[in-house]
Each structure stands twice: as C-alpha cells, then as structure tokens.
Amino acid sequence: MDERYRNDLVTAAEVGMKNAFAILNNFPVGAAVLTSRGQIYQGCNTQSVISGMGVCAERSAIDHAVACGEYVFDAIAVVSKLEVPIAPCGMCLQYIGEFSQVAGHDIHILMVGSTGNIRESSIQKMLPVIFGPLDLGIDLSRFRL
C-alpha cells in the first residue's frame, strides 16, 4: 500500500467510526476506501431495530464511493473501539472481493485497533476463492478507469 495514503485512510475511517449509528450494541465501526484515483471515501456502521436492516461500515464506505462514481479500489481500512483490530465480516469480504474483480487487482485491507495496532492483509488472502461477477460472465470494463 502507498504509504502516503495510509494515515489519511485510517483517519477517514476513524471519522466514520465517530459518525456510526450503533444504537443496539454501542459498537461503532468506521471504514474508508482508497480509490485508484487517490480519493478516499468513508463509511460507518448503521443499525436498525429491524433485524437485518443494518449496514456494515465497509459496505457503507464502498457504497459512498460508488454513489460518487468510483468503482476501483486499492485499499480499505476498518477501525473500531476495540484494542484488537477487527476483520471485515464474511458479507463484507464478499463485497470487497467482488470489487476486486471490478478493479482487476487485489485490495489491501488495513484493520486498526483503538491503540493504533494495525493488522494488514488483502482480499485475496482473506477470501482466496470468490464467486463474483466474472463467474457470471459480466463485463466489468465499463466500471474501470
């Protein structure tokens, strides 16, 4: 991952965490994605009293970028108030994996604990086999730069 973006990406994820709507479990999570154009988009988890209606921070950040016309991501950061860095859930890994197919390359994943300790990985390491749009023969070229 390009070091010049690392701090900005983590800071954006931390801001996202502060905006989280974690009304059920008081467990705010923030995320931020870095696009191949160098833009950063943040997201946060939101919860609802209706089961299944919440949104994870990672998907929120990706959807924020998509709403702004960005589809190609190089990295994503995830932060929470726990000292131990948390990993994206399975649903978020699938979502990130599908966008790695759009990008045509691996997506770096930074997991950051509240004390600043960072665990690094990538979507290919965390979800090495993915069923995604390419398996359905979908042409993703219109979403690339």
What are these regions (language model features)?
Residues 2-22, 70-145:
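C-terminal binding/interaction regions
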Residues 12-15, 57-65:
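Short, well-ordered amphipathic alpha-helical segments that serve as non-catalytic structural scaffolds
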Residues 28-35:
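Short beta-strand scaffold segments in enzyme catalytic cores
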Residues 34, 63-70:
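Alpha-helix C-terminal capping segments
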Residues 45-56:
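Compact, glycine-rich, soluble single-domain proteins
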Residues 56, 60, 91-94:
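Short amphipathic alpha-helical face segments that pack within enzyme cores
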